């Protein structure tokens, strides 16, 4: 007998789980992506300069990553190096996406499960696995949305608009960020930082309690970990691809243009999402992969959380439920790093360089919240 969980809620996109059961025993379980996007075919023979505008429509949640990856791929093909001001603003754009995404994942998608409710908006009335008062839970929900909103505002500030940003262009950005606007955004993030830390401390507490109740942190089968990094500190703007072995004692680093030499993509019969492997081995991406790869977050509060995480779970850590704690570390990092950038002048210097389009091949790599994203254009 096949049992379906459909539709899945609190995820990006559309999917279901098919479970094959015989006499009460689970024989197999398949995660099935049910929606064909097809953008690889839609954009064939389209003008190259449309890619940064069209490809963000692939995903409303990660539109920023597609926007920046598309621009980087064209710049690679045209042999363009954007100016320093543009790189700072693009990094801010990626940090805004990280902040907004991780706040959504932690507080809207998974915190309700840890408290035994179906929605963050029901924390105060229905939570059954907490000793907090109704008023305290109401404040948790309100503050969670406040932190998420800071990420939304940061994307708008750096990208021109929140959904489908437009500010990154081939050669740079359309303009800097005025000093007053940067100061207001910095003040909002400075106010959000202690709130984010307080919320993450609470999330950590209820996650530990969940692990103790379950007696496990979920599947802890070893895997390789894939991330786009620069050195050993976070860089969501992307530089090279880095694969850490399951034991943590070996690694491979390679540029985006060589990804087919190392990574293998295989289609599946039961899903529109395929499987990617590294030289025949299972790989994981996303937050836990990045935390396993990094030895230093580069900012003080995030570093304290990273140290706590490594002391508690080791490095590399494999348990599946640890992805969420890793997201919390990145949430704090995104706020701290954005504050640093917003403390610098962002309205001085050239926002873009002139260029002439040319035939060629380009690769654009960024580290999206869900893992490395590569745009490859010819």
What would you call each of these model-derived segments?
Residues 1-372:
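Active-site bordering "gate/hinge" segments
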Residues 372-378:
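C-terminal hydrophobic structural anchor segments
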